[in-house]
A protein has these predicted regions:
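Short beta-strand-to-loop acidic/aromatic patch adjacent to the donor-nucleotide binding site
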Residues: 74-85
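Cell-envelope/extracellular polymer assembly enzymes that use nucleotide-activated donors
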Residues: 3-5
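Glycine-rich, basic loop-to-helix element that forms the pyrophosphate-binding segment
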Residues: 53-69
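Conserved catalytic core of nucleotide-sugar-dependent glycosyltransferases
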Residues: 87-88, 92-123
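Active-site regions of enzymes building and remodeling cell-envelope glycoconjugates
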Residues: 44-54
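A conserved acidic beta->alpha catalytic loop
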Residues: 35-44
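Short, well-formed alpha-helical segments that are part of the catalytic scaffolds
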Residues: 13-26
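Short hydrophobic beta-strand elements that form part
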Residues: 7-8, 78
Length: 123
């Protein structure tokens, strides 16, 4: 059976992290890791926390999560940031869509005001 690994990336937003973590149900994944790229410590009794030296950047934090989850034997890796909340098991939906389409990476159509049409072009 395939295993699902989840990496949560957080940086100096403990309230966001707490809400994000609480929205991810334990039955949705097999392995989980939190990578904290902020200066303030994050504690989570349900998952390991890897602390960077702080300010390494989201890319490096995601690579740390991927490396950890691969070491855990995860077949599917889902990376989330601390400002994401889940009310349904989106992870299974992503995996199903991957199997049906062959697309390995899904992007959100909207990720902040700068991605609205015209704004990113300075209009």
């Amino acid at each position: 059976m395939s295993s699902i690994g989840v990496g949560i990336i957080t940086c100096n937003r403990p309230d966001f992290f707490k809400k994000c973590r609480e929205s991810i149900k334990e039955e949705w994944y097999d392995s989980i890791v939190v990578v904290n790229d902020g200066k303030d410590p994050i504690f989570d009794s349900r998952s390991p926390v890897i602390q960077t030296s702080g300010g390494e950047g989201v890319g490096k934090a995601k690579n740390i999560a991927i490396e950890y989850l691969l070491e855990q034997g995860s077949d599917y890796i889902i990376l989330v940031e601390d400002d994401m909340l889940f009310k349904d098991n989106l992870f299974e939906q992503y995996i199903r869509a991957y199997k049906e389409t062959g697309i390995h990476h899904f992007m959100f159509a909207y990720h902040g005001p700068a991605n609205k049409a015209g704004i990113s072009r300075g209009k």
